[in-house]
Protein backbone atom coordinates (compact mmCIF):
# COMPACT_ATOMS: atom_id res chain seq x y z
CA UNK A 1 0.00 0.00 0.00
CA UNK A 2 2.82 2.39 0.89
CA UNK A 3 4.53 1.62 -2.43
CA UNK A 4 1.31 2.37 -4.33
CA UNK A 5 0.90 5.66 -2.47
CA UNK A 6 4.49 6.69 -3.19
CA UNK A 7 4.06 5.71 -6.85
CA UNK A 8 0.82 7.71 -7.13
CA UNK A 9 2.45 10.77 -5.58
CA UNK A 10 5.44 10.41 -7.89
CA UNK A 11 3.20 10.21 -10.96
CA UNK A 12 1.26 13.27 -9.78
CA UNK A 13 4.42 15.31 -9.21
CA UNK A 14 5.83 14.20 -12.57
CA UNK A 15 2.59 15.22 -14.31
CA UNK A 16 2.65 18.66 -12.68
CA UNK A 17 6.30 19.12 -13.69
CA UNK A 18 5.57 18.15 -17.31
CA UNK A 19 2.57 20.48 -17.34
CA UNK A 20 4.64 23.40 -16.05
CA UNK A 21 7.34 22.82 -18.66
CA UNK A 22 5.07 22.42 -21.72
CA UNK A 23 3.82 24.89 -24.32
CA UNK A 24 0.44 26.56 -23.81
CA UNK A 25 -2.32 27.03 -26.36
CA UNK A 26 -3.88 29.86 -24.36
CA UNK A 27 -2.56 32.51 -21.98
CA UNK A 28 -4.51 34.44 -19.36
CA UNK A 29 -2.57 37.31 -17.79
CA UNK A 30 -4.22 38.66 -14.64
CA UNK A 31 -2.88 41.99 -13.36
CA UNK A 32 -3.72 43.16 -9.85
CA UNK A 33 -3.08 46.87 -10.22
CA UNK A 34 -1.12 48.12 -7.19
CA UNK A 35 -1.04 44.60 -5.73
CA UNK A 36 2.12 43.99 -3.76
CA UNK A 37 2.81 41.12 -1.41
CA UNK A 38 1.24 43.05 1.46
CA UNK A 39 -2.06 43.52 -0.38
CA UNK A 40 -2.09 39.80 -1.15
CA UNK A 41 -1.39 38.96 2.47
CA UNK A 42 -4.13 41.32 3.66
CA UNK A 43 -6.63 39.38 1.60
CA UNK A 44 -5.21 36.08 2.77
CA UNK A 45 -5.36 36.90 6.48
CA UNK A 46 -8.91 38.25 6.19
CA UNK A 47 -9.97 35.16 4.24
CA UNK A 48 -9.07 32.50 6.78
CA UNK A 49 -5.36 32.50 5.86
CA UNK A 50 -5.94 31.16 2.35
CA UNK A 51 -6.24 32.39 -1.24
CA UNK A 52 -6.78 30.79 -4.66
CA UNK A 53 -3.40 32.28 -5.61
CA UNK A 54 -1.74 29.64 -3.45
CA UNK A 55 -2.57 27.02 -6.07
CA UNK A 56 0.27 28.47 -8.17
CA UNK A 57 3.51 26.72 -7.23
CA UNK A 58 5.74 28.73 -9.57
CA UNK A 59 6.47 32.10 -7.98
CA UNK A 60 8.89 34.92 -8.81
CA UNK A 61 9.44 38.65 -8.35
CA UNK A 62 9.14 41.45 -10.90
CA UNK A 63 11.22 44.66 -10.94
CA UNK A 64 8.90 47.54 -11.75
CA UNK A 65 11.03 50.68 -12.35
CA UNK A 66 10.34 52.60 -15.56
CA UNK A 67 12.64 54.24 -18.11
CA UNK A 68 12.16 57.60 -16.40
CA UNK A 69 11.45 56.86 -12.74
CA UNK A 70 12.46 54.55 -9.90
CA UNK A 71 8.73 54.32 -9.15
CA UNK A 72 6.58 53.54 -12.17
CA UNK A 73 3.07 54.64 -12.95
CA UNK A 74 0.44 52.34 -14.48
CA UNK A 75 1.13 53.64 -17.99
CA UNK A 76 4.79 52.65 -18.00
CA UNK A 77 4.13 49.59 -15.85
CA UNK A 78 1.34 48.37 -18.11
CA UNK A 79 3.39 49.08 -21.23
CA UNK A 80 6.31 47.03 -19.89
CA UNK A 81 4.02 44.04 -19.30
CA UNK A 82 2.12 44.46 -22.57
CA UNK A 83 4.83 45.58 -24.98
CA UNK A 84 8.07 44.33 -23.43
CA UNK A 85 9.80 47.72 -23.21
CA UNK A 86 10.65 50.17 -20.46
CA UNK A 87 9.07 53.52 -21.19
CA UNK A 88 8.55 56.89 -19.51
CA UNK A 89 5.86 57.35 -16.92
CA UNK A 90 2.58 58.41 -18.49
CA UNK A 91 3.17 56.80 -21.89
CA UNK A 92 1.03 54.01 -23.33
CA UNK A 93 2.15 51.39 -25.86
CA UNK A 94 5.27 53.35 -26.83
CA UNK A 95 8.95 53.10 -26.03
CA UNK A 96 10.89 55.90 -24.35
CA UNK A 97 11.51 57.47 -27.78
CA UNK A 98 7.76 57.73 -28.46
CA UNK A 99 7.79 54.93 -31.03
CA UNK A 100 4.77 52.62 -31.02
CA UNK A 101 5.51 49.03 -30.00
CA UNK A 102 3.31 46.01 -30.69
CA UNK A 103 1.71 44.57 -27.57
CA UNK A 104 1.48 40.86 -26.85
CA UNK A 105 -2.25 41.12 -27.55
CA UNK A 106 -1.62 42.64 -30.97
CA UNK A 107 0.98 39.97 -31.78
CA UNK A 108 -1.47 37.25 -30.74
CA UNK A 109 -4.10 38.81 -32.97
CA UNK A 110 -1.68 38.96 -35.93
CA UNK A 111 -1.05 35.24 -35.43
CA UNK A 112 -4.78 34.47 -35.62
CA UNK A 113 -5.33 33.89 -31.91
CA UNK A 114 -8.47 35.23 -30.27
CA UNK A 115 -7.83 38.18 -27.95
CA UNK A 116 -9.59 39.89 -25.09
CA UNK A 117 -9.46 42.44 -22.27
CA UNK A 118 -11.55 42.47 -19.10
CA UNK A 119 -11.09 45.30 -16.61
CA UNK A 120 -12.59 46.39 -13.29
CA UNK A 121 -12.23 49.99 -14.50
CA UNK A 122 -12.69 51.88 -17.77
CA UNK A 123 -11.24 50.00 -20.74
CA UNK A 124 -9.49 53.27 -21.64
CA UNK A 125 -7.58 53.38 -18.35
CA UNK A 126 -3.80 52.97 -18.34
CA UNK A 127 -3.38 49.22 -17.83
CA UNK A 128 -5.92 47.91 -20.36
CA UNK A 129 -4.95 50.72 -22.74
CA UNK A 130 -1.34 49.47 -22.74
CA UNK A 131 -2.45 46.32 -24.56
CA UNK A 132 -4.43 48.06 -27.28
CA UNK A 133 -3.36 51.70 -27.71
CA UNK A 134 -0.32 53.80 -28.60
CA UNK A 135 -0.39 57.33 -27.16
CA UNK A 136 2.16 59.50 -25.37
CA UNK A 137 -0.21 60.50 -22.57
CA UNK A 138 -2.31 58.04 -20.59
CA UNK A 139 -5.06 60.66 -20.16
CA UNK A 140 -5.88 60.69 -23.89
CA UNK A 141 -8.98 58.60 -23.22
CA UNK A 142 -10.86 59.42 -26.44
CA UNK A 143 -7.80 58.58 -28.55
CA UNK A 144 -7.39 55.33 -26.62
CA UNK A 145 -11.05 54.45 -27.29
CA UNK A 146 -10.44 55.08 -30.99
CA UNK A 147 -7.56 52.61 -30.95
CA UNK A 148 -10.00 49.80 -30.08
CA UNK A 149 -11.47 50.33 -33.55
CA UNK A 150 -8.03 49.90 -35.12
CA UNK A 151 -7.75 46.30 -33.94
CA UNK A 152 -9.74 43.10 -34.30
CA UNK A 153 -9.84 42.35 -30.58
CA UNK A 154 -12.60 39.79 -30.03
CA UNK A 155 -13.79 40.74 -26.55
CA UNK A 156 -13.39 43.74 -24.28
CA UNK A 157 -15.40 44.39 -21.14
CA UNK A 158 -15.22 47.20 -18.57
CA UNK A 159 -16.32 50.78 -18.07
CA UNK A 160 -15.64 53.99 -19.97
CA UNK A 161 -18.67 54.07 -22.30
CA UNK A 162 -18.65 57.88 -22.47
CA UNK A 163 -15.31 57.87 -24.31
CA UNK A 164 -16.98 55.92 -27.12
CA UNK A 165 -20.08 58.11 -27.55
CA UNK A 166 -19.73 61.53 -25.86
CA UNK A 167 -16.70 62.72 -27.78
CA UNK A 168 -15.19 66.03 -28.81
CA UNK A 169 -14.95 64.81 -32.42
CA UNK A 170 -18.67 63.83 -32.43
CA UNK A 171 -17.86 60.30 -33.57
CA UNK A 172 -20.08 57.57 -32.17
CA UNK A 173 -17.69 54.68 -31.71
CA UNK A 174 -20.47 52.41 -30.49
CA UNK A 175 -22.15 52.68 -33.89
CA UNK A 176 -18.77 52.05 -35.49
CA UNK A 177 -18.27 48.97 -33.31
CA UNK A 178 -21.66 47.64 -34.39
CA UNK A 179 -20.70 48.26 -38.02
CA UNK A 180 -17.67 46.03 -37.38
CA UNK A 181 -20.04 43.28 -36.16
CA UNK A 182 -19.47 43.78 -32.45
CA UNK A 183 -22.30 42.86 -30.13
CA UNK A 184 -22.44 45.78 -27.69
CA UNK A 185 -23.51 44.90 -24.14
CA UNK A 186 -24.39 47.34 -21.36
CA UNK A 187 -24.96 44.95 -18.44
CA UNK A 188 -23.11 41.95 -17.06
CA UNK A 189 -26.18 39.79 -17.76
CA UNK A 190 -26.01 40.81 -21.42
CA UNK A 191 -22.31 39.94 -21.46
CA UNK A 192 -22.97 36.49 -19.99
CA UNK A 193 -25.67 35.81 -22.58
CA UNK A 194 -23.29 36.22 -25.53
CA UNK A 195 -21.51 32.97 -26.39
CA UNK A 196 -19.77 33.67 -29.70
CA UNK A 197 -18.76 36.41 -32.11
CA UNK A 198 -17.27 39.77 -31.13
CA UNK A 199 -18.25 41.46 -27.88
CA UNK A 200 -17.82 45.03 -26.63
CA UNK A 201 -19.05 45.17 -23.05
CA UNK A 202 -19.27 48.82 -21.99
CA UNK A 203 -20.97 48.35 -18.65
CA UNK A 204 -20.49 51.75 -17.03
CA UNK A 205 -20.58 55.33 -18.26
CA UNK A 206 -17.24 56.12 -16.62
CA UNK A 207 -15.36 54.02 -14.08
CA UNK A 208 -16.69 50.76 -12.65
CA UNK A 209 -17.99 51.01 -9.06
CA UNK A 210 -15.90 49.64 -6.22
CA UNK A 211 -16.62 46.40 -4.39
CA UNK A 212 -19.14 45.29 -3.27
CA UNK A 213 -21.31 47.50 -5.52
CA UNK A 214 -19.64 46.01 -8.60
CA UNK A 215 -20.86 42.53 -7.65
CA UNK A 216 -19.39 39.57 -9.56
CA UNK A 217 -18.65 41.66 -12.64
CA UNK A 218 -14.94 40.79 -12.84
CA UNK A 219 -15.10 36.99 -12.39
CA UNK A 220 -18.30 36.70 -14.43
CA UNK A 221 -17.02 38.84 -17.31
CA UNK A 222 -13.71 36.97 -17.29
CA UNK A 223 -15.36 33.59 -17.67
CA UNK A 224 -17.77 34.94 -20.29
CA UNK A 225 -14.77 36.22 -22.25
CA UNK A 226 -13.00 32.86 -21.98
CA UNK A 227 -16.12 31.07 -23.24
CA UNK A 228 -16.14 33.25 -26.36
CA UNK A 229 -12.37 33.18 -26.93
CA UNK A 230 -12.28 29.40 -26.52
CA UNK A 231 -14.18 29.09 -29.81
CA UNK A 232 -10.90 29.86 -31.60
CA UNK A 233 -9.18 26.53 -32.24
CA UNK A 234 -5.75 28.19 -32.48
CA UNK A 235 -5.93 29.55 -28.94
CA UNK A 236 -6.34 32.89 -27.22
CA UNK A 237 -4.71 35.62 -25.15
CA UNK A 238 -6.73 37.36 -22.45
CA UNK A 239 -5.68 40.17 -20.10
CA UNK A 240 -7.72 40.66 -16.93
CA UNK A 241 -7.18 43.61 -14.59
CA UNK A 242 -8.18 43.89 -10.96
CA UNK A 243 -7.96 47.66 -11.19
CA UNK A 244 -9.21 48.90 -7.87
CA UNK A 245 -6.74 47.24 -5.55
CA UNK A 246 -4.66 50.23 -6.61
CA UNK A 247 -7.38 52.77 -5.87
CA UNK A 248 -8.06 51.38 -2.40
CA UNK A 249 -4.33 51.46 -1.69
CA UNK A 250 -4.10 55.08 -2.87
CA UNK A 251 -6.85 55.83 -0.34
CA UNK A 252 -4.94 53.90 2.36
CA UNK A 253 -8.18 51.98 2.93
CA UNK A 254 -7.13 48.53 4.14
CA UNK A 255 -10.70 47.22 4.43
CA UNK A 256 -11.36 48.12 0.79
CA UNK A 257 -8.03 46.60 -0.25
CA UNK A 258 -9.25 43.31 1.21
CA UNK A 259 -12.55 43.50 -0.71
CA UNK A 260 -10.78 44.21 -4.00
CA UNK A 261 -8.12 41.53 -3.47
CA UNK A 262 -10.76 38.90 -2.69
CA UNK A 263 -12.74 39.85 -5.81
CA UNK A 264 -9.56 39.52 -7.87
CA UNK A 265 -8.71 36.24 -6.15
CA UNK A 266 -12.13 34.79 -6.94
CA UNK A 267 -11.44 35.65 -10.57
CA UNK A 268 -8.05 33.95 -10.32
CA UNK A 269 -9.70 30.86 -8.84
CA UNK A 270 -12.21 30.55 -11.67
CA UNK A 271 -9.49 30.93 -14.28
CA UNK A 272 -7.35 28.33 -12.50
CA UNK A 273 -10.32 25.93 -12.49
CA UNK A 274 -10.60 26.37 -16.26
CA UNK A 275 -6.85 25.90 -16.74
CA UNK A 276 -6.79 22.81 -14.53
CA UNK A 277 -9.68 21.25 -16.43
CA UNK A 278 -8.29 21.90 -19.91
CA UNK A 279 -4.55 21.53 -19.31
CA UNK A 280 -3.48 23.80 -22.19
CA UNK A 281 -3.74 27.23 -20.58
CA UNK A 282 -0.96 29.21 -18.92
CA UNK A 283 -2.19 31.50 -16.16
CA UNK A 284 0.06 34.36 -15.02
CA UNK A 285 -0.82 36.62 -12.09
CA UNK A 286 1.23 39.72 -11.32
CA UNK A 287 1.04 43.49 -10.75
CA UNK A 288 2.25 46.60 -12.53
CA UNK A 289 3.52 48.08 -9.23
CA UNK A 290 2.77 48.25 -5.51
CA UNK A 291 0.70 51.09 -4.10
CA UNK A 292 0.65 52.53 -0.61
CA UNK A 293 3.74 50.97 0.93
CA UNK A 294 1.50 48.73 3.02
CA UNK A 295 2.89 46.94 6.10
CA UNK A 296 1.47 45.07 9.09
CA UNK A 297 3.04 45.84 12.49
CA UNK A 298 0.79 43.24 14.12
CA UNK A 299 -2.26 41.05 13.57
CA UNK A 300 -4.14 37.91 14.55
CA UNK A 301 -4.26 35.00 12.09
CA UNK A 302 -7.03 33.15 13.94
CA UNK A 303 -9.20 36.25 14.11
CA UNK A 304 -8.37 37.22 10.52
CA UNK A 305 -7.35 40.71 11.55
CA UNK A 306 -4.28 42.91 11.15
CA UNK A 307 -3.06 46.41 11.89
CA UNK A 308 -2.41 48.17 8.58
CA UNK A 309 0.23 50.87 8.21
CA UNK A 310 0.65 52.69 4.89
CA UNK A 311 3.78 54.71 4.14
CA UNK A 312 2.47 56.69 1.15
CA UNK A 313 -0.66 57.49 -0.82
CA UNK A 314 1.29 56.93 -4.02
CA UNK A 315 3.08 54.06 -5.70
CA UNK A 316 6.30 52.46 -4.46
CA UNK A 317 9.26 51.04 -6.35
CA UNK A 318 9.49 47.65 -4.65
CA UNK A 319 9.33 44.46 -6.74
CA UNK A 320 5.97 42.70 -6.97
CA UNK A 321 5.27 38.97 -7.04
CA UNK A 322 4.40 36.93 -10.11
CA UNK A 323 2.58 33.60 -9.92
CA UNK A 324 2.15 31.08 -12.73
CA UNK A 325 0.15 27.90 -13.34
CA UNK A 326 0.00 25.58 -16.32
CA UNK A 327 2.26 24.82 -19.29
CA UNK A 328 5.25 27.18 -19.26
CA UNK A 329 4.77 28.19 -15.62
CA UNK A 330 8.35 27.22 -14.78
CA UNK A 331 9.56 30.22 -16.84
CA UNK A 332 8.17 32.64 -14.24
CA UNK A 333 10.38 31.98 -11.24
CA UNK A 334 13.16 34.04 -9.66
CA UNK A 335 13.69 37.76 -10.21
CA UNK A 336 12.84 39.25 -13.61
CA UNK A 337 12.29 42.59 -15.31
CA UNK A 338 8.66 43.51 -15.93
CA UNK A 339 9.40 43.84 -19.64
CA UNK A 340 10.57 40.20 -19.81
CA UNK A 341 7.07 38.83 -19.18
CA UNK A 342 5.92 39.77 -22.67
CA UNK A 343 8.95 38.07 -24.23
CA UNK A 344 8.32 34.90 -22.22
CA UNK A 345 4.68 34.76 -23.34
CA UNK A 346 5.68 35.47 -26.94
CA UNK A 347 8.13 32.55 -26.95
CA UNK A 348 5.70 30.18 -25.26
CA UNK A 349 2.94 30.99 -27.75
CA UNK A 350 5.46 30.85 -30.65
CA UNK A 351 4.45 34.29 -31.92
Language-model region placement:
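Bacterial Sec-dependent N-terminal signal peptides
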Residues: 1-22
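Structural motif
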Residues: 29, 201-203, 237-241, 284
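Functional beta-strand-loop-alpha-helix junction segments that form "active/interaction loops"
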Residues: 95, 185-222
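N-terminal catalytic scaffold of extracellular/periplasmic and nuclease hydrolases
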Residues: 21-160, 164-167, 173-191, 197, ...
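Active-site His/acidic residue clusters
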Residues: 126-131, 205-210, 214, 222-226, ...
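Gly/Ser/Thr-rich active-site loops/lids in small-molecule metabolic enzymes
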Residues: 256-272, 303-316
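Gly-rich Lys/Arg/Thr-decorated short loops/hinges at beta-loop-alpha junctions or inter-strand turns
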Residues: 84-88, 198-211, 246-251, 323-327
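Metal-dependent active-site segment of extracytoplasmic phospho-/sulfohydrolases and closely related
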Residues: 37, 262-301
